[in-house]
């Protein structure tokens, strides 16, 4: 730096306005109020350092009476061409961002966890480091509790070391505290043992089997207390028995016997082939469906087939017996 007063150049450069002034010697508390006609009271140290480096190797200082300015922290500016230059950057802020985004193993005052628990034993260890609010967990149980309840984790403080550890859950059983067994300890003794351990806490945890999801129920396994219902109360349309029953019922309604059929069958007790084709018939599957021992659930039978006489009366057609009587009466008359 070259001061305009003509004195020897100060090899230290300008340190926050502490260089020689035209009217007096160096001052211990001298504020740098303006730089390049810009007020510096509300500027950050990084901005001031950038302005000074932009000014080059020459920095002109002018003394001014003290005014009411913001009493900020000392700002040290060093010429970047000097051997031991101080370069101000955003590294503190960068480190803070790294801390926020870092995994739990790198956060200060966090939990340092041990290796992952063994799947076979279910035991694992966790090491916690005390934070500003403690270890961040609450314990419950102990010998003094009714029934001698085992010591277990009852709660995790939000953003506490125990929660940031990511391995503790509510309901985990605490087997050891700082290498000593918790069997037979009261709740007060367990808390005292944690306090006596200092800023670090080493726990051996066992996760109860009840917290693990159980075996899924089979697809075809019925539930207890539930009576299995039939999948379909209606008869199987593909079965021969019900198919015959349906065809017989349909033929009774839609295909009444004709007079010619009745005339052809009046002389024989057995129906003729023509009558079997036109009139209602009972097929072997129908007879099988009429079996009283048939216990198939949902079957509509047994079917009742009306006699020829009743069918003739219902349809208003003369029966075979009536036709035979009329024929006999006609012969007698002749």
UniProtKB/Swiss-Prot annotation:
SMART domains: PDZ. Keywords: Phosphoprotein. The keyword Phosphoprotein applies. Gene3D superfamilies: 2.30.42.10. InterPro entries: MAGIX, PDZ, PDZ_sf. Residues 244-260 have a biased composition (Polar residues). Residues 1-26, 209-306 are annotated as: Disordered. Residues 125-209 form the PDZ domain. It comes from the Eukaryota. PROSITE patterns: PDZ. PANTHER family: PDZ DOMAIN-CONTAINING PROTEIN MAGIX. This is PDZ domain-containing protein MAGIX. It comes from Homo sapiens (Human).
């Amino acid at each position: 730096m070259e001061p305009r007063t003509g004195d020897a150049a100060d090899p230290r450069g300008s340190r926050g306005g502490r260089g020689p002034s035209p009217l007096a010697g160096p001052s211990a508390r001298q504020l740098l109020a303006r730089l390049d006609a810009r007020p510096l009271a509300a500027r950050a140290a990084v901005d001031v350092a950038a302005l000074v480096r932009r000014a080059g190797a020459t920095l002109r200082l002018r003394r001014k009476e003290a005014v009411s300015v913001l009493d900020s922290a000392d700002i040290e500016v060093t010429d970047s061409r000097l051997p031991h230059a101080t370069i101000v950057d955003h590294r503190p802020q960068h480190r803070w961002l790294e801390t926020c985004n870092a995994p739990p193993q790198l956060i200060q005052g966090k939990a340092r966890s041990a290796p992952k628990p063994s799947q076979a034993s279910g035991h694992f260890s966790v090491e916690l480091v005390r934070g500003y609010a403690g270890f961040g967990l609450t314990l419950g149980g102990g010998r003094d509790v009714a029934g001698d309840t085992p010591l277990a984790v009852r709660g995790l403080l939000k953003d506490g070391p125990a929660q940031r550890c990511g391995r503790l859950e509510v309901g985990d059983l605490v087997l050891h505290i700082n290498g000593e067994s918790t069997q037979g300890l009261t709740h007060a003794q367990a808390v005292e043992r944690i306090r006596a351990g200092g800023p670090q806490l080493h726990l051996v945890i066992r996760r109860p089997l009840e917290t693990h999801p159980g075996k899924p129920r089979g697809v075809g396994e019925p539930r207890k207390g539930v009576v299995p219902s039939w999948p379909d109360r209606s008869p199987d349309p593909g079965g021969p028995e019900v198919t015959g029953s349906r065809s017989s019922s349909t033929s009774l309604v839609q295909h009444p016997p004709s007079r010619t059929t009745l005339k052809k069958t009046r002389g024989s007790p057995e129906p003729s082939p023509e009558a079997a084709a036109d009139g209602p018939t009972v097929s072997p599957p129908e007879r099988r469906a009429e079996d009283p021992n048939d216990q198939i659930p949902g079957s509509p039978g047994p079917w009742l087939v009306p006699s020829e006489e009743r069918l003739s009366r219902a349809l208003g057609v003369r029966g075979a017996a009536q036709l035979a009587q009329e024929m006999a009466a006609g012969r007698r008359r002749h």
